[in-house]
Amino acid sequence: MQPPGDDAAPRCPFAGAHAPDAPHVPEAAGDDAQAGWHRAQLDFSQSMSYGDYLSLDPILDAQHPRSPDHNEMLFIIQHQTSELWMKLALYELRAALASIRDDALPPAFKMLARVSRVLEQLVQAWNVLATMTPSEYSAMRPYLGASSGFQSYQYRELEFILGNKNAQMLRPHAHRPAIHAHLEASLQAPSLYDEVIRLLARRGFPIAAERLDADWTQPTRHDRTVEAAWLAVYREPNAHWELYEMAEELVDLEDAFRQWRFRHVTTVERIIGFKQGTGGTSGAPYLRKMLDVVLFPELWHVRTTL
């Protein structure tokens, strides 16, 4: 029930004119002409429509195939939608980082779980691109120039936030000063896992000083004091429930991230084989090497120690 004096809650732009629980009232013949189809609002000359709310015009006008090939539209939309999902993943990860710094773990759990679900969407998206055959891709590949997913600055920020730091990966963005500066700040900041390790220290676990004061521009490396802390958490989960849940959220996240990488490799092998990538990398062999990267090493190693 609405408290007296409170304004009515704003209506979801996707909902109809009536509340979801409003009873259906059959309309008299001829009512549709004036009341709208099933009483839905049909005139948006003075109000915001679905397309207005979502800014659909610029989004749907952002696909500009460079080749005459029919399949290029699939290629463009696959990558554009992936960038949108990455935008959401980054949005949630930044919020999770802030929550962890503030010791507000339940909201961080929700955000990290959402990122894992976003990664599942990205995994499934490869199934759509995999409908493109090698001959179809070969017809449009010359029009791509040197552009490559390797140059995705959102993907690079995602890698940096998850702890896979590499200063050389700033170079493809030197021609975009604002993006370069943003990525450099992310490179130099503590990663998600760095903040979780700081959390372990705040909760009383003896983390080595050199780990807490690490060079944030370097990739995550295994630390025995961090593994000892996680071992204590896993041996007595009820005594450290929030940290135990955090550990499992991180494992879920890396699991989903690995699946995304693996699906990327297999899709590339299926479509282009072992040709060099458009961005100059070795293509599939480079992507296979990336499968060996471990983001949260102690959380995986502790499973053997238990």
From Swiss-Prot:
Subunit: Homotetramer.
Q: Transmembrane ranges?
A: none
Cofactor comment in the record? Answer: Binds 1 heme group per subunit.
Protein function:
Heme-dependent dioxygenase that catalyzes the oxidative cleavage of the L-tryptophan (L-Trp) pyrrole ring and converts L-tryptophan to N-formyl-L-kynurenine. Catalyzes the oxidative cleavage of the indole moiety.
Which residues lie in coiled coils? none
Q: Where substrate is bound, by residue? A: 75-79, 137, 141, 278
Chain intervals for the UniProt region annotation (Disordered)? 1-33
Cofactor(s) of this protein: heme
- Name the Gene Ontology biological process terms: L-tryptophan catabolic process to acetyl-CoA; L-tryptophan catabolic process to kynurenine
Q: What is this protein called in UniProt? A: Tryptophan 2,3-dioxygenase
Gene name in the database record: kynA
Q: Where is the signal peptide?
A: none
Instruction: Give the source lineage, highest ranks first.
Output: Bacteria, Pseudomonadati, Pseudomonadota, Betaproteobacteria, Burkholderiales
What's a Gene Ontology MF term here?
Answer: heme binding
Report the top EC class in one word: oxidoreductase
- UniProt cross-references to InterPro entries, sorted A to Z: Trp/Indoleamine_2_3_dOase-like (IPR037217), Trp_2-3-dOase_bac (IPR017485), Trp_2_3_dOase (IPR004981)
UniProt binding sites for heme: 264
Instruction: For this UniProt record, give its keywords in alphabetical order, as a comma-separated list.
Output: Dioxygenase, Heme, Iron, Metal-binding, Oxidoreductase, Tryptophan catabolism
Task: Tell me the route in metabolism or biology where this protein functions.
Answer: Amino-acid degradation; L-tryptophan degradation via kynurenine pathway; L-kynurenine from L-tryptophan: step 1/2
Any one Pfam family here would be Trp_dioxygenase
**Which protein family is named in the record?**
Belongs to the tryptophan 2,3-dioxygenase family.
Catalytic function, reaction form = L-tryptophan + O2 = N-formyl-L-kynurenine
List its EC numbers.
1.13.11.11
Q: Return the PANTHER family for the record.
A: TRYPTOPHAN 2,3-DIOXYGENASE
